[in-house]
Amino acid sequence: PMRRDTIIQIFSMTKPVTGVALMQLWEQGKFGLDDPIATYLPEFANMQTSAGTDANGVVRYRAASRHITIRDVMRHTAGFANSGAETPAHVAYTKADPSALDHDLAEMGRRLATVPLLYDPGERWYYGIAPDVQALLIEKISGQPYAAYVKQHIFDPLGMKDTAWR
């Protein structure tokens, strides 16, 4: 049976923790919600969007209509694909494998930035890897590793001594 001191894996509950951590930095004036993520993550400066196929079935790409903003990343409207379908963007995501568990956040970002967007930033909601990009933004903006930032600014002040990443 579960007790007050039972230790469990919290899995997706890291998403709200990550959101809180990023918003702490916003409250401190470290960034604006409408800042392009490329300001902090330059690898995302020239994102491409799938533009269909030509008469021969070759996939075409075009420049995204605008930069991805931190607001887009916070609300899953950045246009990031995932491995859930067979569009060209999904296939490229699967090949780049940004979410592999052996990658650190910096490598995840480098790989994700090579994947064309599924749609233009802000165009629609699509669930995916955005919380990982939020964690990478936390590292870049705070200058601390993500796990260290969250421990110092969220878990320790709340007395959550047994909560951590591994």
Would you name each region that the model predicts?
Residues 1-126:
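Active-site-proximal loop and beta-strand segments within enzyme catalytic domains
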Residues 19-20, 132, 148-149:
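A generic alpha-helix surface/boundary motif
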Residues 22, 150, 159:
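Active-site-flanking alpha-helical
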Residues 23-28, 132-140:
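Short glycine/serine- and small hydrophobic-enriched flexible loop segments
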Residues 119-120, 163-166:
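Glycine- and aromatic-rich loop/turn segments at beta-sheet edges
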